[in-house]
Regions:
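Hydrophobic alpha-helical transmembrane segments
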Residues: 2-116, 132-138, 145-146, 152-288
Length: 288
């Protein structure tokens, strides 16, 4: 990562070095997604999805086509991550008798960490982009800028407080399985945005929007619906609906502001999808 202070002048040779380094970084990033058809078995594709999505050190890289071929399992992968959150919450509550607020904070910290903070970064950039006055090109440039503005920081604070609050409410209801359903539904929100959006001309996000088969989306929703119903019944399905609404909403906002869905848009959809899913679960618990 290269950081340039606004207060320091950069001479020509430094600019050339920076340009060369950025080209190397871009090349390395593209190499990750090179269309290498060798060894793209189902298990390797699945391992590639895990490597792409988390900080779990599998170290297995494959083509973007291979990752997309198993994208219907993305919510299931998130469900396993959510299961880890359920286990953590249960241990902290039963063995250490921690307060619900502290447990909720630890659980969301675990989720952010294991996901590598990737989607959080998208939420920050997305917030900065939509708050800028100007055309879609200007908004996209701001969204892709390495600096974080007031809108991004403010959104992050509000989002984190709301997430911790709703998780605390969930624990108050003794509904720990809601952690699993909410995390799984986050990816359904992301996939919903993929289906409803137009791809950008470049960036990682364009592959998911451009090459996302509708059959994969339907399969992902059906699997998620079954899992949600098994663990929480109609409450779980209500949470899944909340995530789908979130995905559609983020797609609409992205179209209005950027015209396309970038990786930052998809990351935002993941985070807002989790939050809205959890809120819908909390609303549904007294109803069902």
């Amino acid at each position: 990562v290269i950081l340039i202070s606004n207060n320091n002048k950069v001479n020509t040779s430094d600019k050339e070095d920076i340009h060369d380094n950025l080209e190397d970084l871009s090349k390395n990033r593209d190499d990750y997604y090179e269309d290498d058809k060798k060894n793209t078995s189902f298990l390797r594709s699945l391992a590639g999805l895990v490597t792409f999505s988390t900080i779990i050190p599998l170290g297995i890289y494959t083509s973007i086509e291979a990752v997309i071929s198993v994208i219907w399992l993305w919510p299931l992968l998130n469900a396993l991550i959510g299961l880890g959150g359920v286990v953590i919450a249960y241990i902290l509550l039963k063995l250490f008798n921690m307060s619900h607020l502290l447990v909720a904070t630890i659980v969301i910290s675990y989720i952010f960490l294991i996901m590598g903070y990737n989607h959080i970064d998208g939420l920050l950039d997305f917030s900065d982009g939509i708050m800028v006055h100007g055309d879609s090109k200007k908004k996209i440039n701001v969204m892709r800028d390495s600096m974080v503005g007031t809108a991004g920081i403010s959104t992050m604070v509000i989002f984190t407080v709301m997430t911790v609050a709703v998780l605390t409410n969930l624990i108050d209801y003794n509904c720990l399985w809601g952690i699993l359903v909410g995390e799984m539904s986050a990816k359904v929100s992301l996939l919903t945005t993929c289906i409803l959006s137009k791809p950008a001309e470049d960036g990682i996000g364009k592959y998911f929007v451009e090459d996302m088969p509708i059959t994969n989306y339907i399969t992902a929703v059906l699997i998620s619906g079954i899992i949600a119903y098994i663990f929480l019944g109609y409450v779980g399905l209500f949470g899944l609906i909340g995530a789908i609404i979130a995905g559609a909403l983020i797609s609409y906002i992205a179209k209005r502001n950027f015209g396309v869905a970038t990786g930052d848009v998809l990351g935002t959809s993941n985070e807002i999808g989790r939050l809205l899913s959890l809120i819908f679960i909390v609303i549904a618990i007294p109803l069902f």
